[in-house]
Amino acid sequence: MERPSIQPVKLLKAISSTLYKYLLGKFLGLGLQINSFDFPEGYLPVPTPARHYIDTFLNEFDSTVRGRVVEFMPPFYQERYIGRSEITSYDVWDVVPSTPATIVADLQSAPTVGEGSFDTILCTHVLCNIQYPWLATREMHRMLDTGGLVLCTVPMILQGYAPHPGDYYRFTTDSLRTLFEDYSKVELRSYGNPATASGSPQYLMCNHFSSRVLNYHDPVCPSIVAVAAWK
């Protein structure tokens, strides 16, 4: 019986993959000793791939932001939208009294906020810090006016994000689809790839990746996932 032939290209690829994984494991082990595991100082928001992907998502739906808008603390996108003619009001929401919050309430149950109060809700990397996110998506649905829109991003892979009041969840597109299943229309997005996703716990910033790598999106292993959901 003849021995099966092995194509040189496949063999080289297998060897390269094995060597890469070996070297990566060594470098990650070394990183435990020399990596500072913190964000660069002087940036707000911090220039992470996740923040880049949030901007990419909001850019896609930029023209849909209108009417009475609310954003959850910190209001990174207030300057982007406030002052536009199509924006009639802009609230900032926090769970505790703070500046510049105009609404103080628990998103899981906010009876002081009326039904149909908003036309657009900006919820960027908030649900991961909410103990019962299904209650939050239900409340956002209640607070939206008919035809209103939630623009929501969540991490799929991320280091400890914001421990106050808690850091509870990471999400997939399937979990977002379930959380927003009561909305009339849902559009899901995923951003990032295994390189940017694995770089997150290493505190790698956008400048650590080439533009080609940063803007390559692999739905199997993204950094963040997002949803545009209409009432």
Where are these regions (language model features)?
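Internal hydrophobic scaffold segments of catalytic domains
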Residues: 3-18, 47-48, 171, 177-189
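Membrane-proximal basic amphipathic "stem/tether" segments
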Residues: 1-42, 224
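Conserved SAM-binding loop and adjacent beta-strand
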Residues: 43-54
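Acidic/glycine-enriched edge-of-secondary-structure segments
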Residues: 38-45, 94-96
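S-adenosyl-L-methionine-dependent methyltransferase catalytic module, highlighting the catalytic core
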Residues: 134-135, 139, 146-231
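Conserved SAM-binding loop
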Residues: 61, 67-162, 227-229
